[in-house]
Amino acid sequence: MGCGNSTAGGAGGRGATGTTKDAAEESVSDDDKRRNYGGVYVGLPSDAAAMVSGQTKAAPKD
C-alpha cells in the first residue's frame, strides 16, 4: 500500500482533475488534435477520412 493513491484525498483530487481534463479537451483546436506526440501521429489525415467515408457508402450493396 505504498502507492499513496488509496487515500480519500487522492481519490477526490483525481476526480476533480478528470473533470478539468475533459473540459480542456473540448476546447482543443483541430490542429492540436492532429499533433505529433513523440513520433506517433495522433489523428487521421484528411485522405484517410475521405477513404473511410467512401468505403462506408459502398458497403451496403444488396
UniProtKB/Swiss-Prot annotation:
Pfam families: OCC1. Residues 1-62 are annotated as: Disordered. InterPro entries: OCC1. Residues 1-16 have a biased composition (Gly residues). Belongs to the OCC1 family. This is Overexpressed in colon carcinoma 1 protein homolog. It comes from Gallus gallus (Chicken).
